[in-house]
Amino acid sequence: MAESKCPFKSQGSRSNVAGGGTRNTDWWPEQLKLNILRQHTTVTNPLGADFDYAAAFNTLDYDALKKDLTALMTDSQEWWPADFGHYGGLFIRMAWHSAGTYRVFDGRGGAGQGQQRFAPLNSWPDNVSLDKARRLLWPIKQKYGDKISWADLMILTGNVALESMGFKTFGFAGGRADTWEADESAYWGRETTWLGNDARYEKGFSGSDKQGTVIADEASHKTTHSRELENPLAAAHMGLIYVNPEGPDGNPDPVAAAHDIRVTFGRMAMNDEETVALIAGGHTFGKTHGAAPADNVGKEPEAAGLEAQGLGWQNSHGSGKGPDTITSGLEVTWTKTPTKWSNQFLEYLFKFDWELTKSPAGAHQWVAKNADDIIPDAYDAFKKHKPTMLTTDLSLRFDPAYEKISRRFLENPDQFADAFARAWFKLTHRDMGPRARYLGPEVPGEVLLWQDPIPAVNHALIDTVDTAALKRDVLATGVNPSKFISTAWAAASTFRGSDKRGGANGARIRFAPQRSWEVNNQPWLQESLSALEGVQSRFNASRPDRKQVSLADLIVLAGCAAVEQAAHDAGFPVRVPFTPGRMDASQDETDVESFSHMEPIADGFRNYAKPYVHGRAEHYLVDKAQLLNLSAPEMTVLVGGLRVLNTNYDGSAHGVFTSRPGVLSNDFFVNLLDMNTAWQAGHNGEIFEGADRKSGAKKWTATRADLVFGSHAELRAVAEVYASADGQRKFVNDFVAAWNKVMNLDRFDLQGKQFIYPRL
């Protein structure tokens, strides 16, 4: 009988089916990509548009779930045995690595979307074996279904792991709804090899194509004590969460490693004390795995065959599991009680002198000199080992600032436990945004500064009669309405859908650091705020019925009033929706350093860019639009509207393609697409001049963030809709809808459902 053959032969990634072949990005790698504006919509969500995760979570039998998770910790499975009979260390690492991708500059990364399930994170070298952790969790996820997301479950499991080993956690908040596709918006770096860092650092390491170990670059780099990490990255190597545990580029120098630790943890919003607490606390538990060289480790999950069913890194050494496990390539157990909370990590750190050695996989690590064999083996009860440490562990002793904190924690175990509990909570909740999003019975009562607290509403809210009167008062102040639009936009557009920070609520635009940001044009901002504070003061003083208006509400209302006036002047009267309920935060409730990372380096909506920006304005525009949860049509209509409303940050005429600035017309699109205008690039390729094709008379000036709507084929297609003879009404309506969306992105108090404004 002839041999049976599978009819579907592998054709690689470029097969002759839909999505295969040579793609646009192959022909034009620098083409502006709009795909990040089309992600995470209801189309990709199998639970449907009406699914309300918050409501589902609130029906969860939370105590039963925690009991099941606690039981799992010691239910060792033959297919992936538990170190020391306890999965605690593995699940702490899973939760840490889910949350630890967060970075302060753009708020991307973090645990909030459950992205560890998808590429590239599911295949990063730093996440070896976490595929097994999630599979161990699957029966519990399967049992509780939609009531607990993967994003929440991974973090809660880390908490339960800590509690099951005797540690008292600070609390837990649910509310992380899953996404259903890989997030394409995060910039993870430009390196094309695992563990490379030659793009993020001026003198870095080229990386490797090997899996399952941290590769050491034996070259001595003098810059490792002071090198600058590319923004917005918060990891020292492609495919690592933070730093190379062997030391910078694999060089076992604890002092140089401290520099990388301080930078990477700082970019994850952690100060020195939180950093020491996290490293020392996390390394109280479990072990690392480096039983043999990385040559024994197979393909990562995304490269493995179908038969692997999403698992990767098949290990050919011995049994490939248990005592034969290869994960980081390091073989370190820090304490003699790796399944119990203790102070032993810090005790051993200072008790012993340490000498450099190598793991069975060939990775640099450290062993205690002249120490007894006191560390248990993970699988052989009759076997003991000498204490071992990572290069980055020793940084806590040999960096002067870290040492001071470490010794204080050593002498004050209660301080250490409290610091670790708080730092762990911050690590795992940093990207959740305000407390209004927190769900569940273990939400801590203490309000923390990094949560950007806003006072609860403590007065009666204004009604439609009041809003109408306030709008009249605002427009009667004599301030150019464009400045009210600019102020409202400046306040609301600080929102980041990535970590749910920013927005108009709190009126923090009147405080440091936002009030002095160049993009906010402080003189104009102050003029607008002073006028609004006067309106607010007069209104609040005149009300005997406890009705008050917050400045945060008034900033948004003033912008809405100005937009309505501009639409009326265009001949299309419209009502801009407004919902009161915002409150005013104080300067003391504003973490200045934390908010300083949110200052835009470019904002195409206001034609702003810092002089040292290396990227193209149109790319930064799309980046900003994605953070605002905007679609391509929403981005398009907002830019076109803001230009004719004359809201450029510096009052320039770039992109103001109209003879009637301040009127909400579709002139931007009409004039941009006018073939009677010929464009010429300036000397720097950032500013352009448009002249009449026949006479050569200068007509307009523009930036890249303006002309992209006529240059980019997909954006031009949208622009044509608004430039059409019947497009004015649609333009006004769509602008108002998109404006309202941005003004309310941070109104989680209104979002009883898992709320996402519809995209145009």
Swiss-Prot record:
Reactions that this protein is recorded to catalyse: H2O2 + AH2 = A + 2 H2O; 2 H2O2 = O2 + 2 H2O
UniProt crosslink position (Tryptophyl-tyrosyl-methioninium (Trp-Tyr) (with M-268)): 96-242
Membership in a protein family: Belongs to the peroxidase family. Peroxidase/catalase subfamily.
GO biological process: cellular response to hydrogen peroxide; hydrogen peroxide catabolic process
Gene3D superfamilies: 1.10.520.10, Peroxidase, domain 2
Gene expressing this chain: katG
A GO-annotated cellular component: cytosol
Protein name: Catalase-peroxidase
Keyword set, alphabetical order: Cytoplasm, Heme, Hydrogen peroxide, Iron, Metal-binding, Oxidoreductase, Peroxidase
GO MF, one annotated term: heme binding
UniProt-annotated binding residues for heme b: 283
Free-text function comment from the UniProt entry: Bifunctional enzyme with both catalase and broad-spectrum peroxidase activity.
EC number(s) stated in the UniProt entry for this protein: 1.11.1.21
Active site: 97
Cofactor(s) demanded: heme b
Superkingdom of source: Eukaryota
Enzyme class: oxidoreductase
InterPro entries the record matches: Catalase_peroxidase, Haem_peroxidase, Haem_peroxidase_sf, Peroxidases_AS, Peroxidases_heam-ligand_BS
PTM summary: Formation of the three residue Trp-Tyr-Met cross-link is important for the catalase, but not the peroxidase activity of the enzyme.
Crosslinked residue numbers (Tryptophyl-tyrosyl-methioninium (Tyr-Met) (with W-96)): 242-268
Subunit structure: Homodimer or homotetramer.
Chain positions covered by the region annotation Disordered: 1-24
Organism: Aspergillus clavatus (strain ATCC 1007 / CBS 513.65 / DSM 816 / NCTC 3887 / NRRL 1 / QM 1276 / 107)
